[in-house]
C-alpha cells in the first residue's frame, strides 16, 4: 500500500476501470469527510481517504467537503452501489412503540442542545434512532450522491452490538 500526504491508502489492485464492481462508502461528520472503495468481487477494500479538519462552522465544513468532492475524479465514476454514514450529529434513541406519540425535534432538543434542520430516523428491531443534520450537509448528499443509501453511524454500532449479543446467546 502507498500512503500519501492527504491520508490516502491505495492498494496495487485498485483499478478505476473496474468501478462497476466497486461499492463506495462515505462518512460525513462535522469535522471530517472520508470514503473507501470496496471491491465487491474480492471483498477487499482497495482505496481509503480520510480528511479531518478543524471545525469552524457548518458553512466552512460544507465548503471543505464540497471542495474535496469536486477535486477528486473518483466521484465521477459509476459504482455498483454507494452508502453514506452521518457521524457525530445530534441523535437519540426511542422505543418504537412511542414513535407516533412523540415530537422528534423536541426529543432531540431535550437530549442535545443542538438540533439541525433535517431530521431523519433509522429503525433497528424495536428501536428508532432519531438524528438531525444541517440542511447544507443534506444538500451535499442530494447533489453529489443522490442514489446513496444514508444512515446514522449509531445504526451501525447498534446493529453490531445487537448481533454480537444475539450470537453469544446461541
Question: What name fits each language-model region?
Answer:
Residues 46-68:
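Nucleic-acid-processing active sites and adjacent nucleic-acid-binding tracks
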Residues 20-31, 64-66, 70, 110-119:
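Short N-terminal helix-initiation segments at or just after the protein's N-terminus
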Residues 2-45, 160-170:
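Gly/Thr-rich phosphate-binding beta-strand-loop-beta motif of the actin/hexokinase/Hsp70
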Amino acid at each position: 500500500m502507498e500512503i500519501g500526504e492527504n491520508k490516502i491508502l491505495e492498494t496495487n489492485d485498485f483499478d478505476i476501470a473496474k468501478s462497476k464492481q466497486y461499492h463506495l462508502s462515505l462518512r460525513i461528520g462535522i469535522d471530517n469527510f472520508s470514503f473507501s472503495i470496496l471491491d465487491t468481487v474480492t471483498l477487499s477494500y482497495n482505496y481509503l481517504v480520510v480528511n479531518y479538519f478543524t471545525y469552524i462552522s457548518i458553512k466552512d465544513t460544507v465548503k471543505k467537503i464540497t471542495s474535496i468532492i469536486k477535486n477528486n475524479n473518483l466521484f465521477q465514476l459509476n459504482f455498483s452501489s454507494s452508502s453514506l454514514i452521518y457521524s457525530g450529529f445530534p441523535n437519540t434513541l426511542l422505543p418504537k412503540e412511542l414513535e407516533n406519540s412523540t415530537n422528534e425535534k423536541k426529543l432531540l432538543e431535550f437530549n442535545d442542545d443542538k438540533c439541525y434542520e433535517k431530521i431523519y430516523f433509522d429503525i433497528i428491531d424495536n428501536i428508532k434512532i432519531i438524528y438531525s443534520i444541517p440542511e447544507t450537509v443534506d444538500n451535499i448528499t442530494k447533489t453529489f450522491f443522490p442514489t446513496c443509501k444514508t444512515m446514522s453511524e449509531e445504526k451501525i454500532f447498534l446493529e453490531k452490538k445487537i448481533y454480537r449479543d444475539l450470537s453469544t446467546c446461541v
